[in-house]
Amino acid sequence: MPEIAQAHTPMMRQYLETKARYPDAILFFRLGDFYEMFFEDALTASEALQITLTARSKGDDKVPMCGVPYHAARGYVARLLEKGFKVAICDQVEEPGKSQLVKREVTRVVTPGMVLDDQVLDPREASWLGAVALEDGRAGLALLDASTGQLQCGEVDGDERLVDELRRAGVRELVFSSAADGARTDAIARAAGAPAARRDAAEFDRAEDRLRKHLGVPSLDGFGVSGLPLGLAAAAAALAYLADTQRATPRHVDRISRLSTDDVLLLDEATRTNLELERTLSGGRKKGTLLALLDRTVTAPGGRRLAEWLRYPLTDLARIGARLDAVEELTGAAVAREELALALRPVADLERLLSRLVLGQGNARDLRALAGALLALPALAGVLEARGAARLREAGARLRGLEALAAHLDAAVAEEPPATLREGGFIRRGHSAELDEIVAIAEDGKGWIAAMEAKERERTGIGSLKVRFNKVFGYYLEVTKPNLHLVPKDWERRQTTVGGERFVTPELKTFEEKVLTAEERRAALEERLFEALRQAVAAEAPRVRTAADAVATADALLSLSRVAAERGYVRPEVDASEALEIVDGRHPVVEAVLPDGPAAYVPNDVLVASRGAPECGEHGALLVITGPNMAGKSTVMRQAALVVLLAQMGAFVPARRARIGLVDRIFTRVGASDDLARGRSTFMVEMTETAAILHNATRRSLVVLDEIGRGTSTFDGVSIAWAVAEHLHDVTGCRTLFATHYHELQDLARERPAVRNLTVAVREVGDRVVFLRKLVQGGASRSYGIEVAKLAGLPAEVLARAREILKNLEAMEVDEGGHPALARGRRRRAGPSAAQLGLFGGGAPADPAAEDVAKAIRAIDLDALRPLDALNLLAGWKKSLE
């Protein structure tokens, strides 16, 4: 990029001066009806947006340039944000003059975490900026959603916990101090998966004083954030970033709350992913997730609130109970649900409307939408205040007090205002006597023009005569060439065109001065009136935000009650015990997508309690779950975790009965894949996640483990799985569901008092296997892998060879090295020490005759067996064993 002094034109000097202030952003520079980009920005943007790259002449050089239409800029900005770029919007802040350079200023900087445009934002997703203040071993975190004004802060120990919180919130952008260690901040940003900005360290200083001044309070004690120096430093930096990028004071951020992990159920990234809460494992889609199933909200804020509850389930019994009370009341009252839905429907997105208006980015349509939403609040309040549940009545009470603002906006703003303020006409007649007078002049002018046009046509005989207007010549009379001989001598020629000539008259000049003055006065007055209305809204920002919060809460409660009523969910009993008792539980998403409908789903019981809890003697603390592939082990375990999560977010659950002793954390280790970007194998990923569980699980945690150790050799895998299970039983003592294909782990029940064996039942009918999907007491003897392979369509010759190899393995044949033989003609494995069971407490070589009998028993169709046939079979088996 050239030096500013070398620029050939004043406009290019203006561009370079502006760009120098925003070196890390792509500068959208307004030129007429386009936003233009030059130099490196043009090269970057043209590639990212796949738009044409052209050039602007600069002496002998060509300046790279590209542009996008002003009216379509939103879509292009959104695409750049998706790719992690910042965009500085430089607008013309005065009308173009005839000779002087138009004044231009950056009106806002749009970054991935600083988006207010409703056409760019997902209406049902929060847009969090994460500001981070770092110290050795500890971090302060502030989450700010500029589009709603929500600000919260807290502190965590260690970067791993910090990243967990950043990913849980789904931050779009990070802010660090320029004084922070670069390697550390880069590692955090990579792990969080968000672009990062480095800001002046001064923005993190004197945080408490700056926050008190912004919030207009003598102390932050009332917000519950005292004693969090790092958290407050991050919050102050987040506010500074918002004010700087949006060129406005963020008055809509009128409160701050504590981001606490003490009263919420913690879910790490692996657990949120494995349970498919917001994105599916396959394809990362929203459809097919728990949130998609639960979201029956009417409003966008309600959808965002529901997602927040799903990310942050509670551990406070009183708060859980209050939500459940509200859901229970609405679940049992179909008429009340419909009334509430109808009352919510006219309520627009109060939070985001308020934010745009307060930050100076709103328009007349935003004012109209806000007026309509506020007018609907009294009716909504009445519906809520008539209910019995405390949460519903409280929400209703918080909707009061905005009637005057609603009436004021409704009386001031036209019913269907134009898209931009420049178009004018967005103020209702009767709101301003001065404006009404100016408008009358302008409208009378239209009639005057029509009358003059008719009069001059009659006087001159020029039937095609037109009175027209443009910004260069003002009003003029247009005459085509064939009629020029009819032009009167008192007309003054102004311009010759291809098709004719343009003239003015003294009468038309006088009219123009009068009308143009009126238009200028009208535009200026409408701008002042709009600003007054915007300030009136800003003055009521705290009340509007309170009402918006109440609307979101009521809508989220309605959504949970709709799902509960339609799907037959029940109210869970949530208490301080350490038991987990789910009777006839169902996986909420799986049952909803079954081709034959929810009735086809086979429910299951999950009964488990922490070791030492009164219920542990009956239920056990660690459930070893075995069974064939595809039998439903993973589904049963996931559904147990989802039932706990639903209960602690205050929702009804898919079960006949459920008792949930409070859980502090849910851990899941279900499936794995390579992490090539970080150089980690499948097994390394599996072991890393397992290590995190063993280090962080407590007695109150729920641990769900599926196929631990399968990524390595059989002996290594069994050894690791056994040791992990022992640790969870002996040391942690938490509620654990442990699915495995290592049938040796069933012997844990002989050695550990709180281990119970469960299996998913199957039925063999001839050479077919029927999966019953039912969890029953006992263990499995086979995994039926070959049968599943057959269902998957493996070639017959491959299946036959697999059966042959399996037969050798089951006969305990070994090769010369003592390993299971995969080919025929090997010697039998000798001695008990060679058997895998010997690793954990004794085993004996297999008896071939007994194996044959067992195989025959497994092949029997009991439903078709007559009593006499059974006796004959028994006699034959007895004889063979003797």
UniProtKB/Swiss-Prot annotation:
SUPFAM superfamilies: DNA repair protein MutS, domain I, DNA repair protein MutS, domain II, DNA repair protein MutS, domain III, P-loop containing nucleoside triphosphate hydrolases. Keywords: ATP-binding, DNA damage, DNA repair, DNA-binding, Nucleotide-binding. GO terms for molecular function: ATP binding; ATP-dependent DNA damage sensor activity; damaged DNA binding; mismatched DNA binding. The keyword ATP-binding applies. GO terms for biological process: mismatch repair. The keyword rRNA-binding does not apply. Coiled coil: none annotated. InterPro entries: DNA_mismatch_repair_MutS (IPR005748), DNA_mismatch_repair_MutS-lik_N (IPR007695), DNA_mismatch_repair_MutS/MSH (IPR017261), DNA_mismatch_repair_MutS_C (IPR000432), DNA_mismatch_repair_MutS_clamp (IPR007861), DNA_mismatch_repair_MutS_core (IPR007696), DNA_mismatch_repair_MutS_N (IPR016151), DNA_mismatch_repair_MutS_sf (IPR036187). GO terms for cellular component: cytosol. This protein is involved in the repair of mismatches in DNA. It is possible that it carries out the mismatch recognition step. This protein has a weak ATPase activity. Belongs to the DNA mismatch repair MutS family. This is DNA mismatch repair protein MutS. The lineage of its organism: Bacteria, Pseudomonadati, Myxococcota, Myxococcia, Myxococcales.
